[in-house]
């Protein structure tokens, strides 16, 4: 086999490979000999079929089989001898038609992965924005839990219904004097002020007492899903059967136990921990973004354009869909396709460069994704699809690509955590408002 390097530019490599005709002939002869021993043809004893007949019958198919194997072996040999790490599947092109008795010539073209030097991450300095959950937010969350746990009891003094009360009603809706389908119910629980009914309906029941009949006139919204009712004025005959007042439990140990905690103080601490955890996640996300920005700014090695092309095509498909759906943001909508393509190609190149860098760092640091890590990621996915847990598990179990997609962000997070452990990270106390602010927003002066 003869190998000639014809291109060596940046990450591009191309080789002209020649497999001598004698090598192909020898391989073909060996393969035909194997077939001869296996062949059973009428009129010939086993293993005695003439070679000329074998060549006539199977010569072309054997040549194709031998060529495919010889080409693959030669590619592997070139990859090994030249220590090539292909970024994507190589391109293989025959230089001339394959003919028996002639050398086989073809080109092997590929892009290789870049050599990425080791980085001293101890020289990296980053600020981590941190914020503490405010006491009033804890109280608001506890109040929400109290309201979620409220019950309703019949009023005992015969008073009229007020906002926040629950009325038990029978009603019949009429359009142009005729009852319409879906417009009636009996013993329906309606909380006044919940805005769960047509606008204006609940307001007209405030002041009603148990046993009272009222006529409620409302107009359905113009965008109401049922087209025959949208924008139409409708009359409801309503009978108030019962008025119930809300009973909100105290923040005590009994309420805490309803939420799986032993005491009111334990519930308070759990709520505080949950709220603080949400802020800490925002802090973590913003720190990771700063880290990735710093890594992108600090590394400028060449990247395989085949990978950039693939990444860009994925991004551009999303842009095209956003255009079709009318969901392209104002800034992008104002740009020409040429400018948009240029902008998003830069983003694609950045993503590829960061992906290669993190993969290299992870390999050097022997970062691995354990089954426990994958299980946690899968549990997060399950929480996104309540009631469909079995289907989600089945999907990942039978879809390797989906499992790889689940693994990738876990690996990325672990590599980022490794880098941050080596870097100098300083906590910067900020307000909750500043922590929640998008870093791309213009900074606003603070007093």
Curated annotation (Swiss-Prot):
Gene Ontology cellular component terms for the protein in this record: cytoplasm
Segments forming domain PPIase FKBP-type: 164-249
Record-annotated membrane-spanning stretches: none
One Gene Ontology molecular-function label: protein folding chaperone
Any one of the GO BP annotations: protein unfolding
PROSITE patterns: FKBP_PPIASE
Keyword entries, A-Z: Cell cycle, Cell division, Chaperone, Cytoplasm, Isomerase, Rotamase
Pfam families: FKBP_C, Trigger_C, Trigger_N
Catalytic activity: [protein]-peptidylproline (omega=180) = [protein]-peptidylproline (omega=0)
EC number(s) reported in the record: 5.2.1.8
Keyword presence, Cell cycle: yes
Subcellular location per the Swiss-Prot or TrEMBL entry: Cytoplasm
NCBIfam families: tig
Function: Involved in protein export. Acts as a chaperone by maintaining the newly synthesized protein in an open conformation. Functions as a peptidyl-prolyl cis-trans isomerase.
Record's comment describing the protein's domains: Consists of 3 domains; the N-terminus binds the ribosome, the middle domain has PPIase activity, while the C-terminus has intrinsic chaperone activity on its own.
Family as reported in the entry's similarity comment: Belongs to the FKBP-type PPIase family. Tig subfamily.
Record's protein name: Trigger factor
Annotated organism of origin: Rhodospirillum rubrum (strain ATCC 11170 / ATH 1.1.1 / DSM 467 / LMG 4362 / NCIMB 8255 / S1)
Lineage: Bacteria, Pseudomonadati, Pseudomonadota, Alphaproteobacteria, Rhodospirillales
